[in-house]
């Protein structure tokens, strides 16, 4: 046991030595020593120290009693930021390695420099810059310097205890750099502030003005000012202010007022502000057009033009142009001009004012029309008994012509812009005094024109009655107020013209054809002329009878009656009548259908032709026998192995019949002997559908096909006929 304990002791000692060596290898790095701590910026302190072996980084700590700010840096020197300006800080440093961090170094006191002043700069004039700032904590003075931003020229530096400073004698429109910092009581400078400021430009020089009198606008130009970005031209008058702005050295102001004096000034501006106004110059525009223009013709043939005086006007020019293109004018410094004028002309008058700026704008153009002259070579032409057409040569200056016809008691008038007029609603067989007056809106009518006289044609007769007699003679009666007149009556139609004449109040016409329509008029004639025809009276002779009457049976109870329409007939009435009753139709066509016809009896056919006025002609009579009646109970029966029997019941009356079977494999027809009501088809294919029709046969041999059809199917039983099956009736197509 004792021997074992001696063996363990050396081993334990060896382990302790190893642990001590390991602990020694992982101990913290050395404590660094601060060489110096100083501040160049108001928010930071820079620290310098000797490098510690094995340290990978360093922890800088700044304390002001209220706050602690730490910063890790890689090596010396290092800077702690985020500090307060003009404040004492206790600075310590720790070295950091993989084994940990050292203890804090002995502290070092350092104070941050003063804060930079916050600058506000402006350019109150083109040669000065004003620098302003707020007071800086712990500052007792400030240094401010200025130089051109492009680096050319000298640097001006000023020290002051104030919070503002003005630099003068600078160049206009030039960009400067301003730098400022504060001092503390130890004359240690603080942070600096730097900013740029441009001086405002000088006012533009060499201003030139060009005035456009026609457009009432002015163009301005000037020499460019150093450092100017924009230019503004101002035109001031008593009633308005107009401006234009540009980046160039010219500008135009439009919408100037006539008769106005403007003060013109030009400003240059940049980001620093505007220059002083240039020396104001005066611009006088053209005078305004004269107002209150009056035109008078007194005496006739002399025009006097007058107007009111206008501002800024030196003299006046009046232009007078007639509508034939001739123009005259007068110049005067007064407010009136006189001109010669002629009748029948329209004059266009304008007044302008002139001054050194030019001609005034165009004012109102005035029209003045002198009285028109009388129309000449008037030619009245008789048109009818109640209408006269007047024509004449156009006259100068007339806008309208008034034509008046007077018979002593009544007056008829027409107005027109053309040299022609038709007087209507005149009294027939009357003497009129007809005068044409020229007229325009300004001067009215010329009442000195010479009248013309004319007598109208006789009055038109009035047809009172047109009658017919049994011998197709036409008697016409009329009434008229004319004296010593001869009357002619005319019947005009497609068949020709028929006339009769008389000096009395009636006449007779003979030989008018039937089926014709005539227009009957009467005309009176005297030495003054021929009257207008009377109002026409229609005359219609009885219509001619239709031809080609045809009766066709459509179905068992319906027939169609057709014919060729005779002259004048507009409608027809067809009547079928028998002992069983009557069937009638009234139509405007050349055919009609008559229903409810009884089969197998004799009818009397009557046709009437009726004109548009109701004249009727009984034109045609004919006997017609209606077709035989359709059989009843048509059926199909199997007849032996290959045959079919068609059976029916004969209806009223005796008739012959014909049977037809229509199938896809053929048509099969048979005709029974007289008096029989069945018929056999001995050979017919099975396996088909058949349409069966039994038709009466007229005495003429015509088969009537309007009877109903039935459908049967015939089946096969082996090679022979099978069942005969009824499928229904077939609709007519």
Curated annotation (Swiss-Prot):
Annotated gene: FNDC7
Keyword annotations of the record: Glycoprotein, Repeat, Secreted, Signal
Residue span, Fibronectin type-III domain: 28-115, 116-202, 203-288, 289-373, 374-459, 460-544, 545-632, 631-715
Protein name, per record: Fibronectin type III domain-containing protein 7
Alphabetized SMART domains for the sequence: FN3 (SM00060)
Source species of the chain: Homo sapiens
Major subcellular site: secreted
Domain of life, source organism: Eukaryota
Subcellular location: Secreted
Keyword Secreted: yes
GO cellular component annotations of the record: extracellular region
Pfam families associated with the record: fn3
InterPro entries, per the entry: FN3_dom, FN3_sf, Ig-like_fold
Signal sequence interval, chain numbering: 1-25
Residue runs in coiled coils: none
UniProt-listed CDD domains: FN3 (cd00063)
Residues with attached carbohydrate: 230, 433
